[in-house]
C-alpha cells in the first residue's frame, strides 16, 4: 500500500498498536473507498468521549471480539470515524487527537482549524 498522508500533508504516522486500530487493523488510520465510516481521526479517547459516544448510539466501550474490537478505555489510541468525531466536537465532547496520525480525508468533514484545537502533537 502506498503511504497515505495526514492532515498536515505529511506521511501518515501510526496511531495505536495496543489496542490495534485502523480500518485495516494495521495501527494506522489508513482508509479506502470501502471505509464508509471514514475511520480517520487518531484520537486519544477519554472517558467523557466514550460515554458520550455510547449514549449517542456508538458504543466503543463494549468489546466485540468477532469484529476484532477490544472495547476502549480512557487513554487508548483509536481511529475514530470522522463524522462521529465531528458530532462529539459539536456536543462539546471532543477528545485529544494526534494530527500526525489523522488521515487527510478527515478534512472533508472537519476543517484543520477545528482539528488543531484538539491536537496534542503540535509544538
Question: What is the predicted function of each stretch?
Answer:
Residues 1-49, 112, 119-121:
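Extended boundary segments
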Residues 47-51, 84-85:
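Short, charged/polar surface micro-motifs in flexible loops or helix N-caps
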Residues 61-68:
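Short alpha-helix capping/helix-loop boundary micro-motifs
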Residues 85-108:
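Short, compositionally biased
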Residues 103-123:
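Glycine- and charge-enriched low-complexity intrinsically disordered segments
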